[in-house]
A protein has these predicted regions:
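Outer-membrane beta-barrel proteins
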Residues: 1-128
Length: 128
């Protein structure tokens, strides 16, 4: 599937193009987003270009895994470095129970070379 859109978010111009492709148990996706901030130069904010890619694999009816990356280039901000985010997840379901886990890491968040984040979450849910 191919998706595209353009519009405004307040005074920001936003353009998006994305595609997904599924074959058998594998799905891959790619998205490109560009944000042109009208007041970027005056406020010290940055325009941005974001590229996202992912792959998901359904190992069987109950177990699936996925991996994704996001690279964001910040244009115009003083001393800004590119953001890099990676994440992976796994999900297992059996009857009414679902166990999910994911781990994400971000480097240079907000264009700051000293800003790194990490998040891990495990959840268990039951449907009655």
């Amino acid at each position: 599937a191919i998706y595209a859109g353009t519009g405004q978010d307040g005074s920001n111009d936003v353009d998006v193009a994305a595609l997904t492709y599924a074959v058998g148990p594998v799905t891959v996706g790619y998205q490109y987003t560009e944000i042109d901030r009208e007041a970027a130069a005056a406020a010290g904010a940055a325009d941005s270009e974001r590229r996202q890619a992912s792959i998901a694999f359904a190992i069987n009816d109950n177990l699936s895994v996925s991996y994704g990356i996001i690279d964001t280039k910040l244009d115009g901000a003083a001393n800004a470095v590119d953001e890099e985010i990676t994440g992976m997840s796994i999900g297992y379901s059996m009857g009414g129970m679902t166990l999910n886990a994911h781990h994400n890491e971000g480097e240079n968040m907000g264009g700051n070379a000293l800003n790194e984040v990490e998040h891990t979450e495990i959840s268990l849910s039951f449907a009655f």
